[in-house]
Amino acid sequence: MSRLEQRFAELKAEGRSALVTFVTAGDPGYDASLQILKGLPAAGADVIELGMPFTDPMADGVAIQLATLRALEAGQTLAKTLQMVREFRVDNQTTPIVLMGYYNPIHRFGVEPFVAEAKAAGVDGLIIVDLPPEHDAELATPAQAAGIDFIRLTTPTTDDARLPRVLERSSGFVYYVSVAGVTGAGSATTEHVTEAIARLRRHTDLPISVGFGIRTPEQAANIARLADGVVVGSALVDKIAQAKSADQAVNDVLSLCSALAEGVRGARR
């Protein structure tokens, strides 16, 4: 059983949703970013998505684009992102880490060495936003062969004809993007999310995590009543942007994570 399967199974047994947090690797700098990464589980993160900075993050809203820019300016590379995961795993062998980003940096790194190093570092899953199922052979197949889950994004515009193709080789969990557009934009209605989850469940047994537009503990709790996972990214990344120092960035991100976790954990009581 993979770490992701294990975590979602444990939470299902507890009768609660997972808090899935997104931060960009290397934002605001390597050391502070590593501190945030290491602090997230104790602050209540059940699964961590770690963004791999790339110069052209087309699916991301302004907050995550700026985070990517800060990380790249601070010297973050894909090799350093894998190093962060290695350092995280020294103290934590249970919290799943999913790398999220675009195919270009992986292609440049080399798929074979990337998959081998990601597995050795302790990466559990990949979300690659610009690789559709038609390109499975490039990365999804070798990653899954190495025991790394490949997580697909589905959106309100993924129709019933397309959905089986998208979900066919998915593993780990399904990431439902509740608002069509870029990250951090708007938020979906509870009714919309309820219908979307019901539709996805007709096609897959995988846990369903809902993200995009969730910013407050209240919003997180509302989604946690419906979905297997609640993904929060831009709201955490904004705390880094607003911080006056690296220490403040660490503290503010972890404080918000704790508040979100409280919302998620109390949602079904």
From Swiss-Prot:
One of the record's GO molecular function terms: tryptophan synthase activity
UniProt catalytic activity: (1S,2R)-1-C-(indol-3-yl)glycerol 3-phosphate + L-serine = D-glyceraldehyde 3-phosphate + L-tryptophan + H2O
Enzyme Commission no: 4.2.1.20
Lineage start: Bacteria, Pseudomonadati, Pseudomonadota, Gammaproteobacteria, Pseudomonadales
Keyword match Protease: no
UniProt cross-references to PROSITE patterns, sorted A to Z: TRP_SYNTHASE_ALPHA
Pathway: Amino-acid biosynthesis; L-tryptophan biosynthesis; L-tryptophan from chorismate: step 5/5
Family of this protein: Belongs to the TrpA family.
Pfam families the UniProt entry points to: Trp_syntA (PF00290)
Protein name according to UniProt: Tryptophan synthase alpha chain
This protein's UniProt keywords: Amino-acid biosynthesis, Aromatic amino acid biosynthesis, Lyase, Tryptophan biosynthesis
Subunit comment: Tetramer of two alpha and two beta chains.
Active-site positions on this chain: 49, 60
Organism of this sequence: Pseudomonas putida (strain GB-1)
Function statement: The alpha subunit is responsible for the aldol cleavage of indoleglycerol phosphate to indole and glyceraldehyde 3-phosphate.
One GO cellular component term noted in the UniProt record for this chain: cytosol
